[in-house]
């Protein structure tokens, strides 16, 4: 598009540090930068408000369709607003705050079981890997909510370890699927495939999901008046989706609702380990709770929620580009006219580091021992973590805060994620108030450097702690 030639451009490699490079460019040249001949990145709050405004006309780009196999649709990849609204009406009810209150005991039981596993590790090994256990917990929670029974990662970690083969690679795998789709097409004919174990795990997950769906259908037939509630009970009764579509839909819930929650919890505990003042203030607030508190009480703890909000600002798991398409007729965004059909991408990574909106968002200290790309990748480790900024947030801060996506397509599972994060943080710190990051087995801060693909993960895929 000829009119985009006037915009400054950058080259973005597939290296897990794309967002740091994009941030560097936006800081250097202004609020808009061209990343491909037909796509721009924007870090301009008025433009972000317009792009993500409900019924604003900026539809998701065709890129989203490349996230799923041919013939498969998920809530994430739906483009047409009417169809999306219909799906959301069917799916949103069980994920409302009211409905989640009914499953709180189940979620709490999984949290307690996870903390017991961590305690067992600490007693027998002296360290425990929170990345592993938070992922196991979140996966069991969302799988039980989806299918009526958990996959069983907490109860049978060795037998179900294949799930981690998939979740560990999901971010980079989707980056390759969307950028080099031929790798997946030709992969079945190649003796060596970069995602062999992850693809095998997808097959096992599908097999487990199909069996669980069949069992739940049988359960509904046996107890039609009072079946065990799941996220998809309404869909079973409405008979709007076949088993193939239900399998993929539930699988997408597991992908979206496990790794994201686990990584957020990991970085929250990591941030607490790095700042004793934050730890002590949070512990003092938690100690005011009764012994058998409920989640609703946690919703009203100001400092706990400030810590969670700041974690989601600094360590937003889905902080990569959210591509939308400029409507026919074009639009002027960030001072530039963009023709209709141009892809415009916003991303939480740069918005959450906009100093005009979030004062002092960084405290980066270059280290000469790191290479250029490594410095970009570890940049976020030194980003300033300040929960107090959320005591009286400005409207600009609220509008720029996008850990769950833009207003028009907000993540449907954000209430569930926040419930898990609040319950887990509180119960874990009650059990282990003096938790510290371990230095055993070569554990270091650089293991927590963020790898940014479709979703973010710590580079070392671990957080070893002692308590």
Swiss-Prot record:
Pathway involvement of the protein, from the record: Secondary metabolite biosynthesis
InterPro entries the record matches: Cyt_P450, Cyt_P450_E_grp-IV, Cyt_P450_sf, Cytochrome_P450_monoxygenase
Binding site for heme: 411
Signal peptide coordinates: 1-28
Enzyme nomenclature, EC number: 1.-.-.-
Cofactor: heme
Taxonomy, superkingdom: Eukaryota
CDD domains linked: CYP_fungal (cd11059)
Induction behaviour: Expression is under the control of the azaphilone cluster-specific transcription factor azaR.
Keywords of the record: Heme, Iron, Metal-binding, Monooxygenase, Oxidoreductase, Signal
GO-annotated molecular function: heme binding; iron ion binding; monooxygenase activity; oxidoreductase activity, acting on paired donors, with incorporation or reduction of molecular oxygen
Uppermost EC category: oxidoreductase
Family as reported in the entry's similarity comment: Belongs to the cytochrome P450 family.
Role of this protein: Cytochrome P450 monooxygenase; part of the gene cluster that mediates the biosynthesis of azaphilones, a class of fungal metabolites characterized by a highly oxygenated pyrano-quinone bicyclic core and exhibiting a broad range of bioactivities. In the first step, the non-reducing polyketide synthase azaA forms the hexaketide precursor from successive condensations of five malonyl-CoA units, presumably with a simple acetyl-CoA starter unit.
Protein's name according to its UniProt entry: Cytochrome P450 monooxygenase azaI
Species for this entry: Aspergillus niger (strain ATCC 1015 / CBS 113.46 / FGSC A1144 / LSHB Ac4 / NCTC 3858a / NRRL 328 / USDA 3528.7)
Lineage of the species this protein comes from: Eukaryota, Fungi, Dikarya, Ascomycota, Pezizomycotina
Name of encoding gene: azaI
